[in-house]
Curated annotation (Swiss-Prot):
HAMAP family to which the protein is assigned, alphabetical: NusB (MF_00073)
Keyword RNA-binding listed: yes
Gene Ontology BP annotations: DNA-templated transcription termination; transcription antitermination
Gene Ontology molecular function: any one: RNA binding
GO cellular component term, pick one: cytosol
Pfam families cross-referenced by the UniProt entry: NusB
Top-rank taxon: Bacteria
Similarity comment: Belongs to the NusB family.
Record flagged with keyword Zinc: no
Annotated function: Involved in transcription antitermination. Required for transcription of ribosomal RNA (rRNA) genes. Binds specifically to the boxA antiterminator sequence of the ribosomal RNA (rrn) operons.
Record protein name field: Transcription antitermination protein NusB
Lineage: Bacteria, Bacillati, Bacillota, Bacilli, Lactobacillales
């Protein structure tokens, strides 16, 4: 039987970022997702893996399935003189995750996804990167999402 833990969506987004980052560095999808989810849970002593939440798997699978498409959108929205290869792996991973959740994952309102990825950026990067990510992704906030929060 697998263990179940309750996590907030913010925690799961952070775990998705960690898994995607690990995969970008050459890690395996399931192992990266499982490790990111189980990290800090002391399940190593239990020998039973935790059941991965659907939200986490949907984010990781979605970004990986649409990686080329997401990269094209990011490339088109970078300022002149910048290339996606010039971005740090952390920033590139956060941009992919945020862009996926805002444009292709209909469960989350755009502004919520944007705010969440900015908070993760502040934790794993610096203020300059968080502002850069905010600037690039904020143009994808839909008019409908803006109308709800205004």
């Amino acid at each position: 039987m697998t263990k179940r833990f309750q996590h907030s969506r913010r925690d799961l987004r952070e775990r998705a970022f960690q898994a995607l980052f690990t995969m970008e560095m050459g890690g395996d999808f399931l192992l990266a997702s499982q490790f990111a989810y189980d990290y800090d849970k002391e399940v190593a002593d239990d020998k039973q893996p935790s059941e991965l939440p659907v939200f986490l798997l949907n984010l990781v699978n979605g970004v990986m399935d649409h990686k080329a498409e997401l990269d094209e959108v990011i490339k088109k929205n970078l300022k002149a003189g910048w290339s996606i290869e010039r971005l740090t792996v952390v920033d590139k991973t956060m941009l992919r995750l945020g862009l996926f959740e805002m444009t292709l994952f209909e469960e989350t309102p755009d502004r919520v996804a944007l705010n969440e990825i900015i908070e993760i950026a502040k934790k794993y990067s610096d203020d300059t990167s968080a502002k850069f990510i905010n600037g690039l992704l904020s143009q994808f906030v839909s008019d409908e999402s803006a109308a709800v929060t205004d």
